Amino acid sequence: MDFNQEVLSVLAEVCQDDIVKENPDIDIFEEGILDSFGTVELLLAFESHFNITVPITEFDRDAWNTPNQIIKQLNELR
């Protein structure tokens, strides 16, 4: 599985919704798929799975609002 697919799998697991795999441009916050508690859980999951740390203080919701944006941000941090 490539990195992008792994990110989508982790995201789907945390969101408990496969729509993030089916529609990578869906706004996960606008659609209520992920809330602030879920965001913290997601960042911890990324740290655990990929050893990528995203400080919550540097988390900009507008830059992380879709699966494609999340993949882009994580690729930049790798």
Curated annotation (Swiss-Prot):
Pathway: Cell wall biogenesis; lipoteichoic acid biosynthesis. One of its GO terms (cellular component) is cytoplasm. Keywords: Cell wall biogenesis/degradation, Cytoplasm, Phosphopantetheine, Phosphoprotein. The keyword Transmembrane helix does not apply. It comes from the Bacteria. One of its GO terms (biological process) is cell wall organization. The keyword Phosphoprotein applies. GO terms for molecular function: D-alanyl carrier activity. Belongs to the DltC family. This is D-alanyl carrier protein. It comes from Bacillus licheniformis (strain ATCC 14580 / DSM 13 / JCM 2505 / CCUG 7422 / NBRC 12200 / NCIMB 9375 / NCTC 10341 / NRRL NRS-1264 / Gibson 46). The lineage of its organism: Bacteria, Bacillati, Bacillota, Bacilli, Bacillales.
